[in-house]
Amino acid sequence: MKIIEAKHFDDMSLKAAQFMIEKIQRDPTITLGLATGGTPQKMYELLINDHRTNGTSYHQVTTFNLDEYIGLDRHDPNSYYTYMHKALFDHIDIRDEQAFLPNGTASNFNAECERYEALIQQRGGIDLQVLGIGANGHIGFNEPGTSFESSTHIVKLTDSTREANARYFNDLSEVPTEAITMGIQSIMNAKEILLLASGKKKADALYQLIHGKVDESFPASVLQRHEQVTIIADREALQKVAVSSN
């Protein structure tokens, strides 16, 4: 597990973007696992700037997103489909047919979970998975207690997760109660993982991720078992972790 310390959120975003760009330039056909939310948003802006300025191409890149809300049409302003298109896809040269998200309005959600998991395998698996981390250790929408052996599945969102995401909605009542998420085993199947964290609210979670017991009560702890994990986090998030010079 490699830890890279950033000065602050913008520096974390820059280091993450540079990390991603290097991977894409080295392998133009890379398959990326992508995350949503506030943590990677600035990184996506920097990827767009690099694409426009330096011409880094996504034409042969394939992407799979971690999750999607159940019950939101993909064109709903708060769907992760819309988030990804506004934050990244609409501004780079990725092909629509190469950018995958779970279908939150599928007629059969169990079948959709199986389809999505199979699709990842058919495409050769994920080369680099981007993750954030929740204060309770969740990765994707995999909340505490999720089996480490889980594949893509339906999850009931906890009150704390819904409250954390309510800022994107008009009211807490509008936040969906369920989502489709890649499972913990799905995430662990990625060849390489990049985890981003920023702010003092993530300090306890990062400490537990790095130094805590590997246990399903703290989903991110499973990353200790992965051979290729890079953490890029700012000083506030790393305040409880001793970081050697990088």
Swiss-Prot record:
Q: What class of enzyme is it?
A: hydrolase
Any one annotated GO CC term:
cytoplasm
Alphabetized Pfam families for the sequence = Glucosamine_iso (PF01182)
Domain of life of the organism encoding this protein:
Bacteria
From its record, what is one biological process in GO terms? carbohydrate metabolic process
Give the Enzyme Commission number: 3.5.99.6
- Give the InterPro entries listed for this entry: Glc/Gal-6P_isomerase, Glucosamine6P_isomerase, Glucosamine6P_isomerase_CS, NagB/RpiA_transferase-like
**Catalytic site positions:** 67 (proton acceptor), 136 (for ring-opening step), 138 (proton acceptor), 143 (for ring-opening step)
Task: Describe the reaction catalysed, as an equation.
Answer: alpha-D-glucosamine 6-phosphate + H2O = beta-D-fructose 6-phosphate + NH4(+)
Give the UniProt keywords, A-Z. Answer: Carbohydrate metabolism, Hydrolase
GO molecular function per UniProt: glucosamine-6-phosphate deaminase activity; identical protein binding
Asked if Metal-binding is a keyword of the record, the answer is: no
Write out the pathway annotation from the protein's UniProt entry. Answer: Amino-sugar metabolism; N-acetylneuraminate degradation; D-fructose 6-phosphate from N-acetylneuraminate: step 5/5
Hydrolase as UniProt keyword: yes
**PROSITE patterns the UniProt entry points to:** GLC_GALNAC_ISOMERASE
Q: Which family does it belong to?
A: Belongs to the glucosamine/galactosamine-6-phosphate isomerase family. NagB subfamily.
NCBIfam families from the xrefs? nagB
Function text:
Catalyzes the reversible isomerization-deamination of glucosamine 6-phosphate (GlcN6P) to form fructose 6-phosphate (Fru6P) and ammonium ion.
Write the protein's name: Glucosamine-6-phosphate deaminase
Q: Which organism is it from?
A: Halalkalibacterium halodurans (strain ATCC BAA-125 / DSM 18197 / FERM 7344 / JCM 9153 / C-125) (Bacillus halodurans)
